[in-house]
Curated annotation (Swiss-Prot):
The keyword Transit peptide does not apply. Gene3D superfamilies: Lactate dehydrogenase/glycoside hydrolase, family 4, C-terminal (3.90.110.10), NAD(P)-binding Rossmann-like Domain (3.40.50.720). Its EC number is 1.1.1.37. Belongs to the LDH/MDH superfamily. MDH type 2 family. This is Malate dehydrogenase. InterPro entries: L-lactate/malate_DH, Lactate/malate_DH_C, Lactate/malate_DH_N, Lactate_DH/Glyco_Ohase_4_C, Malate_DH_type2, NAD(P)-bd_dom_sf. Keywords: NAD, Oxidoreductase, Tricarboxylic acid cycle. It catalyses: (S)-malate + NAD(+) = oxaloacetate + NADH + H(+).
Length: 328
């Protein structure tokens, strides 16, 4: 008996990340190889022709799991009964644009999208914000959707998590799949803090295997933090395929579970680890039965506290920068 189709909304559907994302969703990489999907694609009126071109390509792949496609410029159509919403589209920073202008331009987009989700999405909708500044955009959407559970709103730190895994595998000489218990704390920005104090590879402590504080402080943390800029420098374009891959990882693990393994998600704080409530902050989680659960009770040393407070300060500044644009 075939499962009923799940509705997956994707914003910024004509963009580069979506182009790497949509074919993988239609192939079953997001929700499982036995789960039919209906794609509900949102983009601006001027991008509708480009979205239609992408849909022609989706048609031409003849994906068995793709049960339907909706193309629209109306968030209320895109988010209707959505089970998953991937908020990829955001206003990019243009030359000479101040950060506060970027925040307010995105606040406008994400208040509208949050309100539309609030009105028409499934009450269990799983929302992942990919568009930057992702944590604060997720916070804005959450605050604009008072009738949906706060826990439904998440921001993507999985790209930072995966970048950190890859650096640790290269440094330790261990297979990337063998590394467990990595955490990335804070904002999806160069201030975030990749933390491998608890990490193991094939059961051995990575901290003991690598045993290099200077590498951690002066190479590892900045390399992960500035990786996006390094890719733009090398390629001339932003990291779209790796971002799409991280979005797939994030939602797949949230829906299908992590089997006890830690992953990083930006989630609304409950006050743990000294993070004020409701701030969307990257923390280690495990996922089971469609729910995430933060890893509790980790010891925070002085260096980690300083790093965690630094990225929190940036998030608080962003929150305060959009406070006047939010109703509640």
């Amino acid at each position: 008996m075939a499962k009923p189709a799940k509705r997956v909304a994707v914003t910024g559907a004509a963009g580069q990340i979506a182009y790497s994302l949509l074919f993988r969703i239609a192939n079953g990489d997001l929700l499982g190889k036995d789960q039919p999907v209906i794609l509900q694609l949102l983009d601006l009126p001027q991008a509708q022709a480009a979205v239609k071109g992408v849909v022609m390509e989706l048609d031409d792949c003849a994906f068995p799991l793709l049960a339907g496609v909706v193309i629209t410029d109306d968030p209320k159509v895109a988010f209707k009964d959505a089970d998953v919403a991937l908020l990829v589209g955001a206003r990019p920073r243009s030359k000479g644009m101040e950060r506060k202008d970027l925040l307010s331009a995105n606040a406008e987009i994400f208040t509208v999208q949050g309100a539309a989700l609030n009105e028409v999405a499934s009450r269990d909708v799983k929302v992942l914000v990919v568009g930057n500044p992702a944590n604060t955009n997720a916070y804005i959407a959450m605050k604009s959707a008072p009738d949906l559970p706060k826990k439904n709103f998440t921001a993507m730190l999985r790209l930072d998590h995966n970048r950190a895994l890859s650096q640790l595998a290269a440094k330790s000489g261990k297979p990337v799949a063998s590394i467990e218990k990595l955490a990335v704390w804070g904002n999806h920005s160069p201030t975030m803090y990749p933390d491998f104090r608890f990490a193991t590879a094939e059961g051995e402590s990575l901290l003991k295997l690598i045993n290099d504080d200077v590498w951690n402080r002066d190479t590892f943390i900045p390399t992960v933090g500035k990786r996006g800029a390094a890719i733009i420098e090398a390629r001339g374009l932003s990291s779209a395929a790796s971002a799409a891959n991280a979005a797939i990882d994030h939602v797949r693990d949230w829906v299908l579970g992590t089997n006890g393994k830690w992953v990083t998600m930006g989630i609304p704080s409950d006050g743990s680890y000294g993070i004020p409530e409701d701030i969307i902050y990257g923390v280690p989680v495990t996922c089971e039965n469609g729910e995430y659960k933060r890893v509790e009770g980790l010891e925070i040393d002085a260096f980690s506290r300083e790093k965690m407070d630094g990225t929190l300060a940036e998030l608080l500044e962003e929150r305060d920068g959009v406070a006047h644009l939010l109703k509640n």
